[in-house]
């Protein structure tokens, strides 16, 4: 066989046998028949709106995050076995097999693409045979044209008479058979897709049911809340109505004109029902919202007795309180005056007796314990008077000569009355026998107060009588003390014996007219102080008819203001306050020769030169406040015995005149020790 070298003419145009077939360009512009599931560009895309799966698109709260649509098996859609023959060729056209193979090789890529498109179109149509046949025809049209060209060239060489129309019909039938075999392999994929679609629909249905249940539950809760609100509103209305009724009752009880009472409803138990609140009037209406139970009106007069009773009860309670307070106050005063006052040392007119059933105080206790200063004054008679100050209290006693116990005590029953003077309770005009203890040179110095008083009396009498036998006169700005020669026997040199007993010298010393050199005595020798060291500071008379002071402490407080120049320190200028006295046993002994007792008694009793009509009393002995008062702290400080240089003595003369003397203490010499 020889091949013809003629030029192959193009085959005639074959009419379109399938009117529903579209071109490849038109296939992408027209949407698929079932747009609910698949689209043109992505057949298995889920972006298209799906009516049965709206919950996937409207899931704003993430309620359907549990549903998982996996596409792990999506590769099976494109897993085709290309080794199988695409077309079964009949035997009568077996000689054209080689040409078909070559044409298939040339259009291999296009055939695969058309085959995949036909498979996708078949899946999306859910078993629609019409759509599959249309897509198959549309996809196989380019292949048929290629086959026609090859067959025309073959026919011209072999048969030459065959027509291209018969060949195209045969090739079209073979393509239909190959598509049918491919559809059988894709049935499993369709089943899986259907199962997945059913599962998705079931999950969507379950989600809808769950939403419906939640909505019903919320509606039920809203209804219950509305019922509760209605119930509370009803209760509030009832309470408000009851409050209005109570206010009306209070207005009636207080006496205000009663308001028009509301009509009482029958007493029925109020049942709270879950209904909306009752409609009421506008704001400010006094109409009761609910029925008010009937209240029994109480008469106005019934409240008045209660008020009266309440007032009576209040008055009784107040009376009880006042009575209890007054009773407590009375008990306090009874305790104060009945218990505390008797312990205080009361001195009336120089006497201290029993008070409140307490025992009398023994004067000798002050001498034994040395808790205060002791003043002893004697005028030569048998009666002596002791005065002691301890812890701010003043004590005095009278001692008769020869009537003294072993301890120096006092017999209070032996108090003779003085003619023309008050009784023993007011015997402030009696002479006071005093001896003064003054701290000096780190010890206690005993000053004989008797000598001071006698020198004062001698000076006064010498001035009054104007006698010419004055032995010495010292003149300064202020009147000085003078001692007449006739009364020199009154200045007896003290001899300390026993409990501050005064022992003068013999009359032989006084008859010589010499000055006595000693007011202090230690060891029986040594000049310490004379009477010329005392100077009168001032004096004043008591008003005629005045009562003699019964307390020595009050007089000393009065004259304390005149002595000092600082009036604001009155409470700190008692010299005998706060000054401790400590006498040890070694200081209670004295050395030296003492005159015999007979000479002493003779001197005391035989002194006829001293007038007996005059009386004197040492009221107080003061220290210089400039030496014992601290100017910064305004407090009394214990003085330094070495720096103490001056004392002040206040003497009461004949109960009509107070005289204050300033006595200068010696700066050198032996310090005195007294028993």
Curated annotation (Swiss-Prot):
Residues linked to a glycan: 427, 469, 562, 589, 601
GO MF entry, a single one: DNA-binding transcription factor activity
GO CC field: cytoplasm; endoplasmic reticulum; endoplasmic reticulum membrane; Golgi membrane; membrane; nuclear envelope; nucleoplasm; nucleus
Annotated InterPro entries: bZIP, bZIP_sf
Region (Leucine-zipper): 229-236
Membrane-spanning parts: 324-344
Keywords on record: Activator, DNA-binding, Endoplasmic reticulum, Glycoprotein, Golgi apparatus, Membrane, Nucleus, Stress response, Transcription, Transcription regulation, Transmembrane, Transmembrane helix
Chief location of this protein within or outside the cell: endoplasmic reticulum
Segments on the Lumenal side according to the record's topology features: 345-675
Induction of the gene: By heat shock.
Oligomer and partners: Homodimer. Hetereodimers with BZIP17, BZIP49 or BZIP60. Binds the CCAAT box-binding heterotrimeric factor composed of NFYA4, NFYB3 and NFYC2. Interacts with SAR1B and STL2P. Interacts (via C-terminus) with MED37A/BIP1 and MED37B/BIP3. MED37A/BIP1 and MED37B/BIP3 dissociates from BZIP28 under ER stress.
Family per record: Belongs to the bZIP family.
Function: Transcriptional activator involved in ER stress responses. Functions as a stress sensor and transducer in ER stress signaling pathway. After proteolysis by SBT6.1 (S1P) and S2P, the N-terminal bZIP component is translocated to the nucleus, where it activates the expression and production of ER chaperones. Following ER stress, activates proteins involved in brassinosteroid (BR) signaling, which is required for stress acclimation and growth.
Protein's UniProt name: bZIP transcription factor 28
Species in which this protein is naturally found: Arabidopsis thaliana (Mouse-ear cress)
Primary gene name: BZIP28
